[in-house]
């Protein structure tokens, strides 16, 4: 009798172990690259040194670096879900974020004002992106940027893109903008309080205080100036706002038929495909569009000042006329929800 029981227990234990090991194997995430990681790093080192990275910087950056399974899993299994406009805005333009933002803007008023004066982007928009990206610097990411980018470049899903970002990250270390131990960011390699990728860092990061470092992690002047410089280089107009919520005429379907796009959207298609054609404010006025309070639209006669209509929740939701500055925000993140979140948050941070 005891022999039979022992055999049953043993068989059951084997089944459990088989199931558990199978589940672990199924859940295990490994890089999709047949080349050993050490060989891949050696090839990368040759390329990096050829691009001006010193051996000492490379060795320090890659000390104890191995592929990060968590990063691979996050990259391969990013959640796909549909979030409504109202859910998105209620979470990202919450009263808590507004209250915290007003406090942060007050605490950093001198730095924000100095950046606005020099670069020409209003403080509230700098703060809007700062708040949306990292909750005003509250969380910038705790991943080793070199480890994350090396993992993603080695994984071969988007090797060209992430290899260029990795080489850019090494250049950041080479130029001394930050030390290896403090080089932290998101799992995808976005860095600092404005969440710049390395290539964006070199295109837009700004050394505002002249200390030869573009410190987008801890230097608030550099943080604000870098965000502002990004917007300015994407066409920001310092004497304009982002747009406005508007009231549409009763025949919304008829209006949309007149103003919908029929041509091909060339840039930021994911967001701009949902926009109308661009018209002047007098043209929108003639089509029956009014301010949200029912008043006439501003009497702007500049022919270069145009606006496009977007209804992020469909014709039964809010409608917005968006100006050129809205497109500058879209260049930061090509999402109407994101750009409206920044815009509406900025309105609360005046």
Feature locations, PLM:
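A contiguous strand-loop segment
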Residues: 31, 40-43, 47-50, 55-64, ...
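C-terminal soluble interaction/assembly domains
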Residues: 249-252, 256-350
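Sec/Tat signal peptide C-region and signal peptidase I cleavage site
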Residues: 21-25
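Acidic/His-rich structured neighborhood in mature extracellular/periplasmic domains
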Residues: 85-228, 232, 242
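Bacterial N-terminal signal peptides
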Residues: 9-18
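An acidic, Gly/Ser/Thr/Pro-rich helix-cap/linker signature
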Residues: 26-119
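Bacterial N-terminal signal peptides that target proteins for export
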Residues: 1-9
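Ligand-binding pocket segment of bilobal, Venus flytrap-like solute-binding proteins
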Residues: 213-273, 279
């Amino acid at each position: 009798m005891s022999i039979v029981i022992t055999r049953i227990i043993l068989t059951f234990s084997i089944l459990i172990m088989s199931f558990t090991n199978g589940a672990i194997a199924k859940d295990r995430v490994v890089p999709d690259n047949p080349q050993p990681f050490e060989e891949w790093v050696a090839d990368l080192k040759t390329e990096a040194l050829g691009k001006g990275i010193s051996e000492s910087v490379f060795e320090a950056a890659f000390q104890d670096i191995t592929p990060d399974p968590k990063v691979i899993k996050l990259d391969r299994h990013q959640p796909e879900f549909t979030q409504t406009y109202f859910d998105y805005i209620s979470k990202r333009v919450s009263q808590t974020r507004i209250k915290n933002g007003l406090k942060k803007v007050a605490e950093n008023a001198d730095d924000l004002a100095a950046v606005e004066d020099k670069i020409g982007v209003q403080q509230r928009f700098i703060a809007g992106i700062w708040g949306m990206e990292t909750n005003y610097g509250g969380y910038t990411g705790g991943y080793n940027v070199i480890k994350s980018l090396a993992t993603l470049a080695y994984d071969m899903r988007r090797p060209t893109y992430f290899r260029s970002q990795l080489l850019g990250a090494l250049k950041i270390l080479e130029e001394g903008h930050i030390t290896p131990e403090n080089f932290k960011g998101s799992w995808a390699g976005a860095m600092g309080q404005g969440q710049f990728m390395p290539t964006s860092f070199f295109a837009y990061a700004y050394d505002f205080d002249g200390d030869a470092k573009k410190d987008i992690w801890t230097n608030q002047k550099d943080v604000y100036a870098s965000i502002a410089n990004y917007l300015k280089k994407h066409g920001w107009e310092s004497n304009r706002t982002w747009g406005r919520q508007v009231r549409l005429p009763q025949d919304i379907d008829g209006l949309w038929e007149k103003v919908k796009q029929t041509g091909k959207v060339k840039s930021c298609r994911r967001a701009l495909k949902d926009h109308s054609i661009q018209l002047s404010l007098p043209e929108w006025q003639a089509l029956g569009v009014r301010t949200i309070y029912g008043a006439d639209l501003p009497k702007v006669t500049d022919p270069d000042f145009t606006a496009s209509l977007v209804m992020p929740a469909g014709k039964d939701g809010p409608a917005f006329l968006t100006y050129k500055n809205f497109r500058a925000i879209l260049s930061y993140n090509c999402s109407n929800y994101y750009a409206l979140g920044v815009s509406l948050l900025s309105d609360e941070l005046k």
